[in-house]
């Protein structure tokens, strides 16, 4: 099934514009300890080399009475196989309400299956959220697992400048075990907030696409192009005049466009330790 066709139809569901990126993913209190132990176990087992992963994926499109390809993971050796797409008309779910009831009704697959729920309105101005993996998930953890994404953030949606699908990439990063690249304690340059060695220490989240941003001098410039920052997804370049058609063309340049090798290695190990075969 073509992700691009599905995502284009999802884009038509939302007219919500986003003023700033707001991510609702919150690591559970034991995740730092569990992920550290998982990295150590994977390293001891020799699972640090890159191996191809295919994640069974289910899309659930929620509407309220009106009427994808997740391709940024290819270089990481992680692919997403779209198994099914469901479409549901439910006003409460479309506004982010009754999450448990929605997932109890719609969720498919095991803990290794990614369920993505697209809704036209989310509470608190969120663009989306995913649940971090757990070492020993309860039945409820398995039920609520997955991602809830604002429909307007998919390619062609209305949540500019966050409407190129990078919100889904960002949130799925959390599903795969990645933190934000910036320190959640804003302004703190004393510790590495994301537990990945090749992302420079970053004291603040990014807004826009400010080249050379350096919130922690001496630690390396901020990772403004990283999928796990809060940057805009693209930058509008100066118009280029087309003399043949006598009109100006607007050109865009991607801002959010990369994972580091360290992040890729972490996702691979988190998958093997927390989700594979479950």
Swiss-Prot record:
Protein name: Extracellular metalloprotease MCYG_03238
Active site: 171
Gene3D superfamilies: Collagenase (Catalytic Domain)
Family: Belongs to the peptidase M43B family.
Cited function: Secreted metalloproteinase that allows assimilation of proteinaceous substrates. Plays a pivotal role as a pathogenicity determinant during infections and contributes to the ability of the pathogen to persist within the mammalian host.
Record-annotated disulphide pairs: 209-255
GO BP field: proteolysis
Residues at which Zn(2+) binds: 170, 174
Subcellular location field: Secreted
Keyword field contains Iron-sulfur: no
GO molecular function: metal ion binding; metallopeptidase activity
Leader sequence segment: 1-19
GO CC terms in record: extracellular region
PANTHER family xrefs: METALLOPROTEASE MEP1 (AFU_ORTHOLOGUE AFUA_1G07730)-RELATED, PTHR47466
Keywords (A to Z) from UniProt: Disulfide bond, Glycoprotein, Hydrolase, Metal-binding, Metalloprotease, Protease, Secreted, Signal, Virulence, Zinc
Family matches, as Pfam families: Peptidase_M43 (PF05572)
Residues carrying sugar: 52
Predominant location category: secreted
EC number: 3.4.24.-
Taxonomic source organism: Arthroderma otae (strain ATCC MYA-4605 / CBS 113480)
